Swiss-Prot record:
Ligand binding (Mg(2+) 3): 832, 844
Protein name: Carbamoyl phosphate synthase large chain
Binding residue positions for ATP 1: 129, 175, 181-182, 214, 216, 221, 247-249, 291, 305
Lineage, uppermost ranks: Bacteria, Bacillati, Actinomycetota, Actinomycetes, Kitasatosporales
Pathway membership, UniProt: Amino-acid biosynthesis; L-arginine biosynthesis; carbamoyl phosphate from bicarbonate: step 1/1; Pyrimidine metabolism; UMP biosynthesis via de novo pathway; (S)-dihydroorotate from bicarbonate: step 1/3
Binding-site residues for ATP 2, renumbered to this chain: 718, 757, 759, 764, 789-792, 832, 844
Record's function text: Large subunit of the glutamine-dependent carbamoyl phosphate synthetase (CPSase). CPSase catalyzes the formation of carbamoyl phosphate from the ammonia moiety of glutamine, carbonate, and phosphate donated by ATP, constituting the first step of 2 biosynthetic pathways, one leading to arginine and/or urea and the other to pyrimidine nucleotides.
Stretches for region Oligomerization domain: 409-551
SUPFAM superfamilies: Carbamoyl phosphate synthetase, large subunit connection domain, Glutathione synthetase ATP-binding domain-like, Methylglyoxal synthase-like, PreATP-grasp domain
Region of interest called Carbamoyl phosphate synthetic domain, as start-end residue ranges on this chain: 552-954
GO cellular component, one term: cytoplasm
Entry's free-text remark on domains: The large subunit is composed of 2 ATP-grasp domains that are involved in binding the 2 ATP molecules needed for carbamoyl phosphate synthesis. The N-terminal ATP-grasp domain (referred to as the carboxyphosphate synthetic component) catalyzes the ATP-dependent phosphorylation of hydrogencarbonate to carboxyphosphate and the subsequent nucleophilic attack by ammonia to form a carbamate intermediate.
Amino acid sequence: MPKRTDIQSVLVIGSGPIVIGQAAEFDYSGTQACRILRAEGLRVILVNSNPATIMTDPEIADATYVEPITPEFVEKIIAKERPDALLPTLGGQTALNTAISMHEQGVLEKYGVELIGANVEAINKGEDRDLFKGVVEAVRAKIGHGESARSVICHSMDDVLEGVETLGGYPVVVRPSFTMGGAGSGFAHDEEELRRIAGQGLTLSPTTEVLLEESILGWKEYELELMRDKNDNVVVVCSIENFDPMGVHTGDSITVAPSMTLTDREYQRLRDIGIAIIREVGVDTGGCNIQFAVNPDDGRIIVIEMNPRVSRSSALASKATGFPIAKIAAKLAVGYTLDEIPNDITEKTPASFEPTLDYVVVKAPRFAFEKFPSADSTLTTTMKSVGEAMAIGRNFTEALQKALRSLEKKGSQFTFVGEPGDKALLLEEAVRPTDGRINSVMQAIRAGATPEEVFEATKIDPWFVDQLFLIKELADELAAADKLDPELLAEAKRHGFSDVQIAEIRGLREDVVREVRHALGVRPVYKTVDTCAAEFAAKTPYFYSSYDEESEVAPREKPAVIILGSGPNRIGQGIEFDYSCVHASFALSEAGYETVMVNCNPETVSTDYDTSDRLYFEPLTLEDVLEIVHAETLAGPVAGVIVQLGGQTPLGLSQALKDNGVPVVGTPPEAIHAAEDRGAFGQVLAEAGLPAPKHGTATTFAGAKAIADEIGYPVLVRPSYVLGGRGMEIVYDETRLESYIAESTEISPSRPVLVDRFLDDAIEIDVDALYDGEELYLGGVMEHIEEAGIHSGDSACALPPITLGGFDIKRLRASTEAIAKGVGVRGLINIQFAMAGDILYVLEANPRASRTVPFTSKATAVPLAKAAARISLGATIAELRAERLLPANGDGGTLPLDAPISVKEAVMPWSRFRDIHGRGVDTVLGPEMRSTGEVMGIDSVFGTAYAKSQAGAYGPLPTKGRAFISVANRDKRSMIFPARELVAHGFELLATSGTAEVLKRNGINATVVRKQSEGEGPGGEKTIVQLIHDGQVDLIVNTPYGTGGRLDGYEIRTAAVARSVPCLTTVQALAAAVQGIDALTHGDVGVRSLQEHAEHLTAARD
């Protein structure tokens, strides 16, 4: 039946900041849905607090609210916009939980808003573990297959301890209700572990409910993606098999689509169970994902869980099959049925045809354990990966090897040279699942392990183990051959070996292997993803490489621009860079170019087949990019390759591309070197007469000590050429400097360590600007709230700046122009300054799109990334002003006085990591970046904007209750005024003895509490950590002492994370929070859409 006519406007809830377990895939699905709903003529209202997303661009929805996703704020938006319906299934767990709580509070009923896409009953049946158990039992009664693991529901610690007895002892699995990414879940092997995991699970579950179940470790794990409409048509979009057996969260496992090791009968059985479940739960206007465990010994099937919403797996399934689940879910939600929706890719077949694949897809996760040295790297049922890469091949080995090299991590590809090591040790290592387990398995095979031994140790299915043996046999053949002949080379390529691996095995250079390969005529062809195994013609060019016979790349007339994406998400290089690539693609298509996107990240908008004219789903290595350029050169004219938008990954390829004769447009490789290389950049600054903090480079401890002695401590030490501040540290004395140099393994004359003077108490400033060779456009000036020394990606910042005057902006503009000119930038540049005393120091310059571009663009209502792409291809700022792509006059440095103030706050993944003893990871910020995402708060005054940013990132600031203060000596003076403000707002202050003394002398009363190290008092007085755990503290201010992680502070901050109490670790954040608390208690906090803000800014500019 056709579209419903009673719905005129829809509110879509996004997923908020990127956290582990809920990443860019929801931006992809939300963007798809908003476009579809608007195309259907509905008014779309969107709420999402994350500015780095495409979906929060003003052109995607009719009214875009960058506001915290909390029931209070969403209610304000509903009251203002009065939508007819609410679609909550595209924003992950955040959106689902918000919608459910608004339904329960009666808000939806009060304003007459209908929930579409999933009804409350279906959501509860899918999410509530007890109800879902009932669903599985009902299905078993009907079709005779499928069961749940034996389990017990618990609401308290006593229930939990009894439950273990019922299930027959340890190990048991703990799973909380209504959480995502496996938060709070885990395997408990004894009582101590059980108390820890279940205690955290009860806290995290919004319904204080956990499920204990029998352990099914080592079983095979599968997933099905299904869709159902209200006429009861069901399609199975895709089957996915996990390479790792049960016990590793599916988001952390290598996964394969379609599933490889199921017999036809087993697959039909899973299908039958899946279809029966989606009917029983009652999902009738959308998609869902169901996870199964199969016992390899007797084939017993257990249904683990389902998600009645668009999930991480559905983004993967969409990219793997070309079947756009989110788009179709949005159409089903407004009344269409599957047989009425055409398949975009073939245009001939309806969405009720199930996709069939004539290729294999492998997804590999990307981790960031190097950022949290104390974290436990064992993989469990709690998701820990921060990103993923996907690859497509004609067989499993090709897809697997391509996926591993797409991860761009040292040591992620299989290596076949050097001694493998001891077989017994390697097999023992492979028992514990970690992010490098597949490499340990390969080394064990090289050391002589048998397939049976590998299976015993890892429980990885024998078929997969056999495939690993196949790869190893080919490597042996490559090593033993007299010379590389075309047959052997082609065979190696068909199994996914890269030129780098072949060169390593043969003891040659990569470029020599490539020359031989080209001379022998061994080159890849490109195949199309067409959803139907080539039964119908595909209308959308979505390619993957393979060493096959015929190429499917069609010739074209228009000049092509190849945009290199940013690869898998990781800390320091996330969705913000994808945002710039997508914008470039839109802008260049409009300007008449054929846009070609190269990327391997399945979560993103850039790898959607309708973002660019052609999409290559390929690894971002030199070899793969050169082959794509070659294929596109044969198809028609190539204007050039853009490397400045995808972060550090494509930037690192620019020189090599140029050396291979590929035109790099925009900022040339020489300019990138001038900004990245310390010596060259120092020269640019010297010529422009700009001060930088005193610095030097060293390759030994003696050299570093000499520099530090001359500059004076504290110093900032870091390796060269890194993104996200990897390996940076503030060093306060000589002994720590010595151990830092000793721990840094990668020091060499070509990669020295940089030693800078560290500016204490300086204001850090970030500038994003455009330069076309003649004119500078200042995009925005951001003032950091935390002091210099905290990585800019982790610091909160305000735009327009809140304490800088007109004169300061003039100086910033002149310095930025001098640097852009001196470096030779064409397009975007990001510069970090520090203001200490009255001197403006230059910290560093990045000749590329930075992670603040989306935030700056939204705060000033100017599409910077679009403008940068046009400048790369020769447009001038004057021309873009004439086209109104940039404002006709003024720029981000001359914003009107009543411009709204935007605050960006970083979101950290502390709660996901534990060390091996189960303790938390310390939450102190430093020069190494650790945040996974960001939120934005926007309002007419700073206090409210800051309060909104905190509510969006960590939950609302408290407006009453007890505040605990304990600060380092250097912070005691600056803490007095904010502390007095807190008392004025009616807070009761708690403090440790030293801080309480200073407060008392200044006339502020504070109750003294005991430190953790002092233990309980004689009368049973609790320590501060116990008070926090008992929920008796509402706000914590705790600044660390030097770099020594004094245990007191560590214990306090870890307790704060466990109980979700706001914890401020700098005095600057405290001062901002006080302004926020003030704004919350005095004013009525309103909401305005980005479109209203933009209208206001444009009117003021003209």
